[in-house]
Amino acid sequence: MSTFVAGGNVSANGIRQHYLRYGGKGHALILVPGITSPAITWGFVAERLGHYFDTYVLDVRGRGLSSSGPDLDYGTDACAADIPAFAAALGLDSYHLLGHSMGARFAIRAAAQGAPGLQRLVLVDPPVSGPGRRAYPSKLPWYVDSIRQATVGMSGDDMRAFCATWSDEQLALRAEWLHTCYEPAIVRAFDDFHEVDIHQYLPAVRQPALLMVAGRGGVIEPRDIAEMRELKPDIQVAYVDNAGHMIPWDDLDGFFAAFGDFLDHPLV
């Protein structure tokens, strides 16, 4: 039985924020996807999270059905500030925060800025690039080329050239929704991967945090984990050995197993 409750919109931090809600009961959990992942593409993950949490999946500004266009700020600080504003708009006075990739960077920044009610963070394979650091392994044309094709119109089969290991259903959904990713927002986020050093904010994160590392992602290396442990000594680390950067797409069971009991009870 589906745990999907409803979609909705709230006005928060000066923009329209669209979300999908799953579960509807239990402790609140906000899920912030990655750079070109509208909320609906995380539905297969949220369906399972909905068995355990009152789950809200965000369309980050410039993506999906949230506010978009040339007049918005798509920088890290603005996107991070959207998260506690969203929680406040919905009256979520206690919640966990799960971020993947770009969303994990925003989660770190939001926690460091101060996020009332935030209890625990799950940081799924966040890019660790930044000034003076090695580049993020994915390249900007991979994103831009696929967005431009989706804007014209593309099929799931067309999308296979960009995501060769995905299922037909996953490819079709991405092909359907990728055109909602506003190209300047994506470019700004990608640039911030290299221009904003997210490590600087870790010492200000007071909440317990779990770092989930993709074993085949090429994003986080042992030296990165060591540095993050120096900056936040209590950070927990879990590995999904057989997954690439898009962990749930490669190993959904491994993704949920990696939570352990960090969120108070196992998710398997």
UniProtKB/Swiss-Prot annotation:
InterPro entries: AB_hydrolase_1, AB_hydrolase_fold, AB_hydrolase_sf. GO terms for cellular component: membrane. Residues 28-251 form the AB hydrolase-1 domain. It is an enzyme of class 3 (hydrolase). One of its GO terms (molecular function) is hydrolase activity, acting on carbon-nitrogen (but not peptide) bonds, in linear amides. The active site is at 101 (charge relay system), 221 (charge relay system), 245 (charge relay system). Deformylase that catalyzes the conversion of N-formylmaleamic acid to maleamate in the aerobic nicotinate degradation pathway. This is N-formylmaleamate deformylase. The lineage of its organism: Bacteria, Pseudomonadati, Pseudomonadota, Gammaproteobacteria, Pseudomonadales.
